[in-house]
Curated annotation (Swiss-Prot):
Protein name listed in UniProt: Altered inheritance of mitochondria protein 24, mitochondrial
UniProt source species: Yarrowia lipolytica (strain CLIB 122 / E 150)
Pfam families from the UniProt entry: AIM24
InterPro entries, alphabetized: AIM24, AIM24_sf, Trp_RNA-bd_attenuator-like_dom
One GO biological process term: inner mitochondrial membrane organization
Amino acid sequence: MRLQLRSFSTSLRRANNVSQQLKDLPSVSGGGPFPLLPQFQPIGTPPSLVSVSLPASSTLFARRGSIVSINGQLDTITSRLSSLSAFARTVQGMPFLYNRISATAPATLLVSTNTSYQSSLAIVSLDGRTDWTVAQRDALFAWAGAALHVQPNTSLFGSARGGTTRWGNTYLTGRGDVALVGRGQIFKIDLSEDEDILVHPANLLAYTTSQGSANPHGQFVKLNHSAPLLQLPKLPFIERLLANNSLLKSYLDSDFHRAVQNTNKSIRKTWAKWFGTGNQLLQIQGPRTILIQSQRTDLREIVSRNDLAKVGSSD
């Protein structure tokens, strides 16, 4: 037997050069009456790195183990482990350990997603006029800004009135930059005032919120499924038998039949509570901006069991 060898030609794709991003150091301090805010710049297609331009006297919060490279004077940079609402985020299964990086001199850092799944990054810039809600538990990746407030949900078992549950949400207010990590690629949708959209909750990464609106977090709806229409042949004998069957009529009017229906509804509700039904959608009204991820997370990670039961058992 002759052994046949096939030759494979390989080509090296040109790597992204990040030298310039590392060399660009901010020249204005992050303190004083007119501070320079840290700047986030995504790198890659889709972005998997973020270049952070850190002015002097400023602070960066980044997920633990995400730092790839640092350009700056080593003796002017300090890093220590910090927790973000450890109890509330632990109960909800959310990451709570972050590196708090401070610099007394200008520095530039590269941070990576460092995830076991295919992911990409999106940068959200807050100017103090628009707030954001992060809908995924593990989407908060890095943030910077002295006037930026990152507030995890502390209502552990409650839901937003008339809308989605706040289980696992994180609220962003103030001024600063935030890096979010999503599964797959991240896309942006802009809705005008008279527009609305249906989004699967497992694909919803983040969205702008307006506290003055009637329903700032959207509302759950159920996608209706029509039963298949079967054309059966007419059987007069069977039709007369069923029409004149007093036993069948008595069964349909009995308490036992109603008990069977209630049991069936209870089973559907329990199944939806623990496993979901796959047809829950979130109706979001404009005006607002939405970030969606191309790959889904487990629906039970972002929606409470009570909300799953309510939507799954509805007709």
